[in-house]
Amino acid sequence: MTRACAPYLKKSGNGRVVNISAFIGLSAEGSSIAHATAKAALIHLNRCLAVALAPDVTVNSVAPGLMDGTTMFNRISADNTEAAKQRAVLKRHSSLSDVADQVLTFCRADTVTGQVLVIDGGIVFH
């Protein structure tokens, strides 16, 4: 998708790419090695694209943790979601609006590129 859009983003002189990754791409935990590896690859692609598309396009990534209201959240037992909440220093899960707000922040920022922001209530520090 980014490859197809890159010429138009560059032509605008103010292009933005915001990838949605996951905290698991920065942490060696969890039960899905394939998922964690794919998210880690996306995070590295994010950095490579930031260099390749500069100076006309910024490329950043949001890496959410467990979010209320998502399919994944609803698949996990209440005991496990509560345990995750208790691990977070803020003692709460992230929300879809937390992620949307950060995407907008990245879209507004002119001098931020190649960054990954974890939104998980303070479980993974990066």
Model segments located where?
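Active-site helix of classical SDR
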Residues: 2, 38, 46
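Alpha-helical segment proximal to the catalytic Tyr-Lys
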Residues: 7, 50-55
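Residue(s) in the substrate-gating loop at a strand-loop-helix junction
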Residues: 22
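Active-site loop immediately N-terminal to the catalytic Tyr-X3-Lys motif
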Residues: 27-33, 91
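Short, small/polar-rich loop/turn modules that mediate ligand/substrate recognition or access, typified
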Residues: 54-58, 112-114
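Conserved SDR Rossmann-fold cofactor-binding beta-strand/turn motif
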Residues: 58-68, 118-120
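A glycine/serine/threonine-rich, flexible loop-to-helix segment
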Residues: 64-87
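C-terminal substrate-recognition "lid" of short-chain dehydrogenase/reductases
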Residues: 92-119, 124
